[in-house]
Amino acid sequence: MNRYQKLCKKLIPFKKGCFIPFVVLGDPSIDMSLKIINALIENGADGLELGIPFSDPIADGEIIQKANLRAFNSKINLHKCFDILSEIREKHQTIPIGLLLYSNLIFKFGINKFYLKCYKIGIDSILIADLPIEESYVFRKYAVINNILPVFICPPDAKKNVIKNIAIHSQGYIYLLSRSGVTGINQEIMIPPLSLINKLKKLTKTPLIQGFGVSYPYQIQKIILSGISGVICGSIIAKLIENYFQDDDKLIKEIIFLSKSFKKATIIIE
């Protein structure tokens, strides 16, 4: 049983969903990035989705693009990202850790070499933002060889054959999009079509986790009530960093408040 399965199995009897924050490694600095991640885990986060900074993050809106720029300004690189990841895994042994990145970073490092490095660090899953499932065979092959769980994005308008492929090959969780487009902060409650949720649940036991625009506790409560296992929240965290990165104490206080309130919202109230 992988860490995602263990997490969901632990939460279901208590009628809780999982809260997975997304943070760009190195934002706003290497040291502060670690402090933010630790504060999230210690105050409610059930798992982590961590971004490797990239110069052209095409799936991301302005807020996450700025987070990538701040990370590059902190002199982050892939090897420093691996060091941060090793430190997080050493401190937090049981929490699921996923990476979100772009395919060119893996190509440049070497596909097998990258997955092997992630396995040695203790990474659970990898989601490649610009990789359609139809073109994923080589990446899936090396993920499986190196005991890394591949994760794929399922858009709300996915066709039948795409849904089936995602259900077969997405192993850590299935990343359900709230909407088409790029990442960002939203005030609306956007839940993927119930027909899509039910179709995926018939095809697989892999947890369904929703992301893109999940920004407030009231949204999270509705999402969990719809039968989705959890949420990924990134832009709202990156916006806090953007607003308070020059005041470390204030930033950590805001992160702690967010983590506690978002986790509380995953508890189903009937």
Curated annotation (Swiss-Prot):
According to the UniProt record, one GO cellular component term is: cytosol
What is the uppermost EC class here? Answer: lyase
- Record key words, sorted: Amino-acid biosynthesis, Aromatic amino acid biosynthesis, Lyase, Tryptophan biosynthesis
Say which species the protein is native to.
Buchnera aphidicola subsp. Melaphis rhois
- Role summary: The alpha subunit is responsible for the aldol cleavage of indoleglycerol phosphate to indole and glyceraldehyde 3-phosphate.
An example Gene Ontology molecular-function term: tryptophan synthase activity
* Pathway this chain belongs to: Amino-acid biosynthesis; L-tryptophan biosynthesis; L-tryptophan from chorismate: step 5/5
The top of its lineage is: Bacteria, Pseudomonadati, Pseudomonadota, Gammaproteobacteria, Enterobacterales
- Gene, per the UniProt record: trpA
Q: Which InterPro entries match?
A: Aldolase_TIM, RibuloseP-bd_barrel, Trp_synthase_alpha_AS, Trp_synthase_suA
Assembly mode: Tetramer of two alpha and two beta chains.
Assigned protein family: Belongs to the TrpA family.
The keyword Lyase is assigned to this record: yes
Reactions the enzyme catalyzes: (1S,2R)-1-C-(indol-3-yl)glycerol 3-phosphate + L-serine = D-glyceraldehyde 3-phosphate + L-tryptophan + H2O
Intrachain disulfide bonds = none
Q: Does the keyword Lyase apply?
A: yes
| Active site (catalytic residues) | E49 (proton acceptor), D60 (proton acceptor)
For this entry, the protein name equals Tryptophan synthase alpha chain
Q: Which PROSITE patterns would you find in this protein's record?
A: TRP_SYNTHASE_ALPHA (PS00167)
Entries under Pfam families matching the protein: Trp_syntA
The EC number of this protein is 4.2.1.20
